[in-house]
Amino acid sequence: KAKCADIDQPCKTSCDCCETKGACTCYKSGCVCRMGSFXATCKK
């Protein structure tokens, strides 16, 4: 799994801090994963 990036950028694979394989967006503070209506936020 890809790690959350240090700079804002979309993740091509799920972040290792997220349980879902949904779309993941990396932010400096962590990452946000979405799968349908489910959303999970997580920090590095």
UniProtKB/Swiss-Prot annotation:
Gene Ontology CC entries for this record: extracellular region
A matching Pfam family: D_CNTX
GO molecular function, one term: toxin activity
Tissue: Expressed by the venom gland.
Compartment(s): Secreted
Entry domain remark: The presence of a 'disulfide through disulfide knot' structurally defines this protein as a knottin.
Name of the protein this chain belongs to: U4-ctenitoxin-Pk1a
